[in-house]
Regions:
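Canonical P-loop GTPase G-domain recognition
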Residues: 3-15, 145-200
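Conserved nucleotide-binding/hydrolysis micro-motifs of P-loop NTPases
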Residues: 58, 70, 77-80, 115-117, ...
Length: 200
C-alpha cells in the first residue's frame, strides 16, 4: 500500500460539509497537542501535510487527506481549555455528526501521550468508541521523551488501563525517531483489507 501519494482534500467545519464516504477512512482522534499532525506527517513521509501547530486547539475542522486506497481523517483536537464553550460545542457536534453517519471506517487511531495518564476527555472518547463498536487502536506518542525505565513503566500502566477492553492494540510511537511507524502502517493496511473483505 502506497502511503506517499497523498494530498489534502477537504476541511469540513459543519456536518453538512462532510464529503461523500466513497472510500475507507482511517480516523485520527486525540487531545489538543498530543501529536496527531506529527503522526500523520510521519506515516506519509511529509514534513507539513498536516500542519503542526505550537498553539493547541488550532484544528477547528475535520480535515480529509486522500491517498490512493483510503482517506486519513483528522478530527479536531479536544480538551483545549482556552477555547470558548460555544466553539467546544461546535467541535463536539461536528465530531458526533461525523461518527453518526454511515461511513466506511475500518479503523480509528486514538492518540494518547505516553508520558501522562489519559485525561477525562481521553477516557470519554475511548468509552464512546468502545460502546459504539468502532474498531480502534491506541497509539502512544512521544515515546522518545522517556528513558527506558520510565518508558516500560508507562507501557505497563497503559496495558493495565486497557486490560478491560478487548482487542485494542497499544502501539508506542515517536515522530522524532519513527519508532512504531511501520507497525501502524501495517495495522492500517490490515484493517482496510479486513474491512473490504467484510463488505464483499
Amino acid at each position: 500500500m502506497n502511503f506517499n501519494e497523498v494530498a489534502f482534500e477537504f476541511a469540513a467545519g459543519r456536518v453538512d460539509q462532510l464529503p461523500e464516504s466513497d472510500m475507507p477512512e482511517i480516523v485520527f482522534s486525540g487531545h489538543s497537542n498530543v501529536g496527531k499532525s506529527s503522526l500523520i506527517n510521519k506515516l506519509v513521509q511529509r514534513k507539513a501535510l498536516a500542519r503542526v501547530s505550537a498553539q493547541p486547539g488550532k484544528t477547528a475542522t475535520i480535515n480529509f487527506y486522500k491517498l490512493k486506497e483510503f482517506r486519513m481523517v483528522d478530527l479536531p483536537g479536544y480538551g483545549y481549555a482556552k477555547v470558548s464553550k460555544a466553539e467546544k460545542d461546535r467541535w463536539a457536534k461536528l465530531v458526533e455528526g461525523y461518527f453518526a453517519q454511515d461511513r466506511q471506517r475500518p479503523l480509528v487511531i486514538q492518540i494518547l501521550d505516553l508520558r501522562h495518564p489519559p485525561t477525562d476527555d481521553d477516557l470519554h472518547m475511548m468509552d464512546f468508541l468502545y460502546r459504539g463498536g468502532f474498531n480502534f487502536v491506541a497509539v502512544l506518542t512521544k515515546s522518545d521523551k522517556l528513558k527506558k525505565t520510565a518508558f516500560e513503566k508507562q507501557i505497563e500502566y497503559y496495558k493495565d488501563i486497557f486490560s478491560t477492553i478487548e482487542h485494542v492494540p497499544l502501539i508506542p510511537f515517536s515522530a522524532q525517531t519513527g519508532f512504531g511507524n511501520d507497525e501502524i502502517r501495517k495495522l492500517i493496511e490490515t484493517s482496510i483489507a479486513n474491512f473490504k473483505n467484510t463488505e464483499v
